């Protein structure tokens, strides 16, 4: 084992005052030569995603001690996307990714920790932790709090998206308030992150593929005992990684990020994975750009039938073999690199050796590579005169991913949702929500409320929605987000007007408005940059330093 970083605070007579502080929190003479390991605990009762984390943190803390390390637990924040969705509070969601990253980096570096075990649940916990882990490059492991089990109503599996869609169903007269109330009361049965292949489960899968969490751990249910066992094992592995000096940047390679992109295509993962992978790769110094997603999409099919557009939830994926089973299928097809390593020091080929070549026959969640749900990945990167830097279209569950129609312009999510619920949006419309980007929002809110209302009204196949904001992992339909440049910095989305004809063509990776370059420039002369919405506080600070979404909406971009 190399010299411990923590020796800066534990060794030598000049560090006697430092040691005195450590003695007060439980250190004894023999402990000052052990690795000090941070336990970044995202426990919170704000959200069901994080309310089960403390038992995992305590088990990991105990396991670190038994394995020869000294744990130091500290808290980090979470917000609940599901609770803040559709409100002003959602502007803080993506901001929380940066706060989580900054807080973990700050605590670990201030205290000269030798490693970190991060525990999280809700969407931004995972990329926030990974950004910090990449910045610090000290031995690290991530423990996912686990997925929620599906809610049940009359034999039907429910998720939180069921409740959002029920709102649209109510306003269009498809259900009554009694049914809405039943869905509300039954869709979230306990602890865990939202149960479909939404953002949290997508990002936990990304971390597993990158090798910074244990195989199978990303799809475990929060309330199952195997999750506690996995937390204990993760702590043991981390202590061993410190001894072997296995560091995150040894694992975060271009090939491992490409593997992660391949897997999110195969499982039908969230659009937010594009934003977060770009951000993590940027921090790690790996050259991954938005075009890599389109390149990989062209060759990797969707082989998992998972919600929001499919039939099954993440616990079903786990029971069918989880991410290792998906990876084995992709490995055999030559679609991922088997030489990438994980935190245990094993290559993908090594740790998948005993995984069956084919998925179990008694399930329909994972398909063979020659019988995919979709022949190409579901996250298409579109470009055109509305998005010169690119944007992300999610086309799973859409029979015809091409629509040309008149623009319906909204300057905020609230205005758009109001119009949808008033039944003002008609088949063939292209709904435009702008000034919701990283700078303009600020914070790049997720548009789950309007997209779910559109689906709930039966317009999911008949209306396109485009935005410089984001979408929830629970969104499906013909939706296009992350349009860059965004409206607030003068992107062309700021120049379109009500009724302009817009083409969204995910087949040919095109998004454009039928206006000449001359007309766009004429309109630009009259465009006025929006006045910042916030003068003080975290949103004001964020809007001044955040990058474009095509670079991951990061706040520490090298100048």
Curated annotation (Swiss-Prot):
Keyword Iron annotated: yes
Binding site for [2Fe-2S] cluster: 49, 122, 194
Keyword Membrane attached: no
Gene3D superfamilies linked to this entry: IlvD/EDD C-terminal domain-like (3.50.30.80)
Alphabetized UniProt keyword annotations: 2Fe-2S, Amino-acid biosynthesis, Branched-chain amino acid biosynthesis, Iron, Iron-sulfur, Lyase, Magnesium, Metal-binding
Residues that hold Mg(2+) according to the record: 81, 123-124, 446
Reaction catalysis annotation: (2R)-2,3-dihydroxy-3-methylbutanoate = 3-methyl-2-oxobutanoate + H2O; (2R,3R)-2,3-dihydroxy-3-methylpentanoate = (S)-3-methyl-2-oxopentanoate + H2O
Family that this chain belongs to: Belongs to the IlvD/Edd family.
Summary of the function given for this chain in its UniProt record: Functions in the biosynthesis of branched-chain amino acids. Catalyzes the dehydration of (2R,3R)-2,3-dihydroxy-3-methylpentanoate (2,3-dihydroxy-3-methylvalerate) into 2-oxo-3-methylpentanoate (2-oxo-3-methylvalerate) and of (2R)-2,3-dihydroxy-3-methylbutanoate (2,3-dihydroxyisovalerate) into 2-oxo-3-methylbutanoate (2-oxoisovalerate), the penultimate precursor to L-isoleucine and L-valine, respectively.
Name assigned to this protein: Dihydroxy-acid dehydratase
Taxonomic lineage: Bacteria, Bacillati, Cyanobacteriota, Cyanophyceae, Synechococcales
Gene behind this protein: ilvD
């Amino acid at each position: 084992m190399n010299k411990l970083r923590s020796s800066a605070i534990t060794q030598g007579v000049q560090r006697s005052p430092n040691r005195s502080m450590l003695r007060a929190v439980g250190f004894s003479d023999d402990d000052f030569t052990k690795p000090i390991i941070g336990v970044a605990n995202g426990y919170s009762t704000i959200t069901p995603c994080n309310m089960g984390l403390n038992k995992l943190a305590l088990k990991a803390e105990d396991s670190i001690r038994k394995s020869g390390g000294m744990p130091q637990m500290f808290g980090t924040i979470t917000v609940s996307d599901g609770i803040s969705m559709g409100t002003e509070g959602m502007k803080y969601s993506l901001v929380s990714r940066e706060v989580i990253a900054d807080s973990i980096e700050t605590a670990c570096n201030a205290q000269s920790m030798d490693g970190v075990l991060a525990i999280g649940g809700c969407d931004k916990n995972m990329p926030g932790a990974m950004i910090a882990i990449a910045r610090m490059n000290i031995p690290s492991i991530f423990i996912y709090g686990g997925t929620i089990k599906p809610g049940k109503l009359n034999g039907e599996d429910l998720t939180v998206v069921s409740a959002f869609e029920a709102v649209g169903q109510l306003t269009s007269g498809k259900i009554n308030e009694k049914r809405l109330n039943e869905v509300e009361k039954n869709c979230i049965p306990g602890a865990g992150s939202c149960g479909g292949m939404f953002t949290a489960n997508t990002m936990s899968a990304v971390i597993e593929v990158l090798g910074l969490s244990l195989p199978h751990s990303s799809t475990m249910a929060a309330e199952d005992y195997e999750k506690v066992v996995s937390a204990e094992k993760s702590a043991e592995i981390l202590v061993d990684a410190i001894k072997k000096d296995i560091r995150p940047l040894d694992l975060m390679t271009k090939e491992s990020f490409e593997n992660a992109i391949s897997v999110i295509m195969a499982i039908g993962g969230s659009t937010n994975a594009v934003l977060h992978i770009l951000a993590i790769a940027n921090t790690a110094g790996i050259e991954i750009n938005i075009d890599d997603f389109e390149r990989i999409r062209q060759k990797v099919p969707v082989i998992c039938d998972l919600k929001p557009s499919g039939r099954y939830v993440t616990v079903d994926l786990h029971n069918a073999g989880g991410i290792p089973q998906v990876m084995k299928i992709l490995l055999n097809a030559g679609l991922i690199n088997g030489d990438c390593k994980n935190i245990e020091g094993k290559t993908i080929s090594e740790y998948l050796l005993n995984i069956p070549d084919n998925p179990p026959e008694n399930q329909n969640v994972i398909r063979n590579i020659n019988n995919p749900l979709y022949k190409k990945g579901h996250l298409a990167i579109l470009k055109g005169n509305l998005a010169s830097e690119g944007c992300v279209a999610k086309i799973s569950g859409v029979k015809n991913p091409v629509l040309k129609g008149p623009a319906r312009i909204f300057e905020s999510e609230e205005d758009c949702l109001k119009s949808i619920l008033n039944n003002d949006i008609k088949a063939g419309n292209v709904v435009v929500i702008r000034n919701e980007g990283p700078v303009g929002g600020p914070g790049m809110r997720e548009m789950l409320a309007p997209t779910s209302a559109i689906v709930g009204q039966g317009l999911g196949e008949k209306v396109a929605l485009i935005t410089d904001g984001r979408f929830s992992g629970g969104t499906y339909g013909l939706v296009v987000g992350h349009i860059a440049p965004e409206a607030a910095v003068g992107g062309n989305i700021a120049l379109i007007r009500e009724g302009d004809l817009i083409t969204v063509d995910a087949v040919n990776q095109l998004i454009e408005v039928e206006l000449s370059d001359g007309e766009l420039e004429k309109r630009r002369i009259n465009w006025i940059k929006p006045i910042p919405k916030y003068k003080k506080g975290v949103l004001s600070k964020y809007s001044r330093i955040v990058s474009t979404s095509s670079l991951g909406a990061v706040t520490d971009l090298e100048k």
